[in-house]
Amino acid sequence: MVHSQLPVVALLRLLCALLLLPSATMIPGGLSPRSVTDPDVQEAAEFAVQEYNALSANAYYYKQLRIVEAQSQVVAGAKYYLTMELMKTKCAKTTGKPKVYKEIQNCELPPKAQQEKLTCRFQVWSRPWLQKIELTKMSCN
């Protein structure tokens, strides 16, 4: 009788061990590393650059050089935590219609001696079913 229970006990132990292993999937509420090339990360980065330029008092536009790091968190939607490098361009902000992301990315950079690079941390909250995306935090240095 004891021998017939051994496979069941072993199977239960294996199942318990598997349940305790960390999961590679996104955990609701937890931060998960993301590839900087994921389309939703790219979309959040574009939005962050657009908002940075709209909110900053700089006379010139800044464009995205690269996404250094990306993480996301499942909340009521998705929150993206982005660390990005931005560079000041030669494109001056003028009154009227502001430039969109793709136009800003086409702006020329000043000569090396005049270049200004920023490292920025952005939090972008996306709720696609509401067609809402917003910049919730921004800090650059």
Swiss-Prot record:
Compartments where found: Secreted
Species assigned in the record: Notechis scutatus scutatus
Function: Inhibits various C1 cysteine proteases including cathepsin L, papain and cathepsin B. This protein has no toxic activity and its function in the venom is unknown. It may play a role as a housekeeping or regulatory protein.
Positions marked as site (Reactive site): 29
Keyword set, alphabetical order: Disulfide bond, Protease inhibitor, Secreted, Signal, Thiol protease inhibitor
Pfam families linked: Cystatin
Alphabetical list of SUPFAM superfamilies matching this protein: Cystatin/monellin
Disulfide bonds, paired cysteine numbers: 91-107, 120-140
Tissues with expression: Expressed at a low level by the venom gland (at protein level).
Cystatin domain sequence ranges: 29-129
Protein name from the UniProt record: Cystatin
Primary localisation category: secreted
Motif Secondary area of contact per record, residues: 73-77
